[in-house]
């Protein structure tokens, strides 16, 4: 049983959710749930109370920047939101910090070490 930080993975691509789960669990994180869109992300974050929300920037019903702000407002606690995208962080400029996210990681560079660096 994992005892690391509790993580909610939010992405509309099942293959990314599955690979992120395997990667994070192998590095000691406790993946407590998954969501495929903004509405379910907000509901799951409220229900599961994760310490970290790994949140895709592009979701089918909204964008990750809006979801990040809503999760903080809706859950009553402040999980560390880490945005991910297949695009480079330079595409998003100051939007990452404005939405309350702890940081950004390109999907190709996702690792437990990168998450720990952002959380430090």
Would you name each region that the model predicts?
Residues 1-6, 112-120:
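Non-catalytic signal-transmission and effector/linker regions of two-component phosphorelay proteins
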Residues 66, 87-105, 109, 113, ...:
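Alpha4 helix (beta4-alpha4-beta5 surface) of REC/receiver domains from two-component response regulators
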Residues 11, 56, 85:
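Active-site residues of response regulator receiver
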Residues 37-40, 63-66:
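Acidic catalytic/metal-coordinating carboxylates
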Residues 14-33:
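Two-component/phosphorelay signaling modules centered on CheY-like receiver
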Residues 65-77:
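Short amphipathic alpha-helix used as the core "switch/output" element in two-component signaling
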Residues 60:
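The feature encodes the CheY-like receiver
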Residues 78-90:
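A short, hydrophobic beta-strand element within the central beta-sheet of small alpha/beta folds
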């Amino acid at each position: 049983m994992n005892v690391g930080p509790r993580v909610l993975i939010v992405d509309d691509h099942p293959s990314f959710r599955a690979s992120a789960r395997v990667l994070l669990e192998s590095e000691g994180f406790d993946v407590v749930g998954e969501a495929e869109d903004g509405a379910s992300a907000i509901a799951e974050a409220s229900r599961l109370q994760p310490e970290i929300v790994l949140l895709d920037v592009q979701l089918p019903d909204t964008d990750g920047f809006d979801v990040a702000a809503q999760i903080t407002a809706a859950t009553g606690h402040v999980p560390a939101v880490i945005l991910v995208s297949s695009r480079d962080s330079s595409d998003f400029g100051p939007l990452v910090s404005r939405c309350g996210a702890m940081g950004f990681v390109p999907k190709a560079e996702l690792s437990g070490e990168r998450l720990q660096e952002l959380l430090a």
